[in-house]
Every structure is written in structure tokens, then in C-alpha cells.
């Protein structure tokens, strides 16, 4: 591949990313602010992030980023959650569930479990 073609493709990819970032502006609204405040105010708990499949990969990255920036956090494997791992979810935690469809049974199980405690905050992110 020639240098000119490589530069063209690189610029094209960057433009796609720029356009995608610009389109996110519309999502900075009241719901976004509420979500951010819930996360910021998680003082006596931890941030637990979960997802299934590709969403699980994203969830794992989010948990790692929260942890590396000083926010107590971990990734909860949704497929193992129903087999004893949900016990890691405790009062004052924030549970963030990432899903493409919002229909994953594994995540529904986490929602059902977490809903039993009013001090656990649930955040759902779907496409």
C-alpha cells in the first residue's frame, strides 16, 4: 500500500471518530448528569460493572478505568453472577449494566438481585 493511500485511510478513520464524538454531545442532558452524580457520590460503596459478550468486554474496561483512577470498582462476570458471585454486590454499591439489547437474562438476574436493596443504585446502558 502506498503512503498516499495510508494517509487517506488514516484521515478518513479520524474523521469518522470525530463525527461520532460530535454526535455524543446531544446525550449530555439531565439523565447524563444524574448518572454522573450517582457515580461521583458512591462514597461508601464500589462501582460494579457488568455485561455479556462484547458488552462484557466494554464493562471490563470501564471497571479497570474506574479502578486505575482511584474509584473502587470491579467487573462482575454476568454468566457467573447467578452462581454465587452476586454476593459481592453490597449496600451502597452502584451497579452499571451494559447491554446491546437490554434483554440478556444474565443481566436481568443481576437487576432482580440488586433491586432487593434500595441502597444499591442501578444504571443501565443500552444501544
Residue ranges: model-predicted function:
Residues 2-45:
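An N-terminal, well-structured beta->alpha segment
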Residues 40, 45-127:
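Glycine-rich phosphate-binding loops that contact phosphosugars or nucleotide phosphates
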Amino acid at each position: 500500500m502506498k503512503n498516499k493511500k495510508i494517509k487517506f485511510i488514516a484521515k478518513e478513520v479520524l474523521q469518522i471518530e470525530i463525527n461520532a464524538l460530535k454526535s455524543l454531545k446531544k446525550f449530555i442532558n439531565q439523565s447524563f448528569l444524574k448518572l454522573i452524580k450517582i457515580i461521583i457520590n458512591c462514597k461508601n460503596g464500589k462501582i460494579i460493572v457488568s455485561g455479556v459478550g462484547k458488552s462484557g468486554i466494554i464493562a471490563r474496561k470501564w471497571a479497570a478505568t474506574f479502578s486505575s483512577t482511584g474509584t473502587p470498582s470491579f467487573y462482575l462476570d454476568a454468566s457467573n453472577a447467578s452462581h454465587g458471585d452476586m454476593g459481592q454486590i453490597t449496600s451502597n454499591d452502584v451497579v452499571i449494566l451494559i447491554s446491546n439489547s437490554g434483554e440478556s437474562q444474565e443481566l436481568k438476574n443481576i437487576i432482580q438481585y440488586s433491586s432487593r436493596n434500595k441502597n444499591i443504585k442501578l444504571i443501565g446502558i443500552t444501544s
